[in-house]
């Protein structure tokens, strides 16, 4: 009986609704239907991504390449996340006093690369705790050449012989730069005078006096490679330490001069370049969410955002400028929030 009914119904269906599959009309209808489905689903998907993005809190690490400043990299990260979530531009958000709050702790020079610790949401409140922690660097120094910036980006100010310097000579003086020592910071730095960075004043041709030596800590230094005029060091140090000053001082101690050719931060606090720093192609909401779980779990419990008092109103307002630790005023001891 069912078969008979099917035979009766089938002709009726064919007669009243002719098969248009494969025709132009069918293709147009399918495209319109798909567009309608996509349009109805997209806002919901973007809204969910935006909600997830604004709920993120904690600290994670990114891989800063050579070229951009730490602040420029932070802006690039922020723009990528806002674009993925379909949120308005940062400029619009500033006017509305609602924005994604991100910050970094521990500046890297534009010519340097490596681990940059980033805080997001309430995680920006944890960044000051990262400043006094240990950092590790691999640097390549060049003997016989001094520059005004103490690295390869500057103007050559002095050249001296280096041909008699041996590996043993370098290894023999490293102990002098280990432990609690005094260090004079570079003139080209983020340290300030009358509210302006020393580097900005130098670029304007202003006369800037050398800053006094200040106490810093070096946990360890080892010479990895020596191929004159280049030498490679592995340095673990505390906050406020300048690798550029170290390399320059080593050159002077060897009766020559030296400047930094390359600088890579391989570790900051518990975060390493190899295991934790996200490259730019992984700056996505999902990747950062996973990284937050992994990285925040490495911090001492008293530093996690779960222990911080929540202030939802302040979390939604952009905070610009530097927050400086009370007991010091060093370039690395500043938290940049955007």
Swiss-Prot record:
Keywords for this protein: Acetylation, Cytoplasm, Isomerase, mRNA processing, Nucleus, tRNA processing
Catalytic residues, chain numbering: 109 (nucleophile)
Source taxon at top rank: Eukaryota
Residues recorded with modification N-acetylalanine: 2
Record's subcellular location: Nucleus; Cytoplasm, Cytosol
Entries under HAMAP family matching the protein: TruB_bact
Family designation: Belongs to the pseudouridine synthase TruB family.
Protein name as it appears in the record: Pseudouridylate synthase TRUB1
Species: Mus musculus
Lineage of producing organism: Eukaryota, Metazoa, Chordata, Craniata, Vertebrata
Originating gene: Trub1
């Amino acid at each position: 009986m069912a078969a008979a009914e099917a035979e009766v119904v089938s002709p009726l269906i064919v007669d009243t609704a002719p098969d248009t599959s494969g025709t132009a009309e069918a293709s147009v209808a399918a495209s319109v239907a798909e567009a309608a489905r996509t349009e109805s689903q997209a806002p919901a998907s973007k809204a969910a991504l935006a909600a997830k993005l604004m709920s993120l809190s904690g600290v994670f690490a990114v891989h800063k390449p050579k070229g951009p400043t730490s602040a420029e990299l932070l802006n690039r990260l922020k723009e990528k996340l806002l674009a993925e979530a379909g949120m308005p531009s940062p400029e619009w958000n500033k006017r509305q006093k609602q924005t994604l709050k991100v910050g970094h702790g521990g500046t890297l020079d534009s010519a340097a690369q490596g681990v940059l610790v980033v805080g997001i949401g309430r995680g920006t409140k944890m960044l000051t705790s990262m400043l006094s922690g240990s950092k590790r660097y691999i640097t390549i120094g060049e003997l016989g050449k001094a520059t005004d910036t103490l690295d390869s980006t500057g103007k050559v100010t002095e050249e001296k012989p280096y041909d008699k310097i041996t590996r043993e000579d370098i290894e023999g003086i490293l102990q002098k730069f280990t432990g609690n020592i005094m260090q004079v910071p570079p003139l080209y730095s983020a340290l300030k005078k009358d509210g302006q960075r020393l580097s900005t004043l130098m670029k304007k041709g202003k006369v800037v006096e050398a800053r006094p030596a200040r106490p810093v800590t070096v946990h360890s230094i080892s010479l990895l490679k020596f191929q004159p005029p280049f030498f490679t060091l592995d340095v673990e140090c505390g906050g406020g330490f300048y690798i550029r000053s170290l390399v320059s001082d080593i050159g002077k101690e060897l009766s020559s001069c030296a400047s930094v050719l390359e600088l890579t931060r391989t570790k900051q606090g518990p975060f390493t370049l190899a295991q934790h720093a996200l490259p730019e192609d992984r700056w996505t909401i999902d990747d950062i969410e996973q990284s937050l779980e992994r990285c925040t779990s490495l911090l001492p419990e008293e530093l996690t955002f779960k222990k911080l008092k929540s202030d939802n109103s302040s979390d939604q307002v952009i905070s610009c400028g530097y927050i400086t630790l009370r007991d010091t005023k060093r370039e690395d001891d500043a938290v940049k929030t955007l």
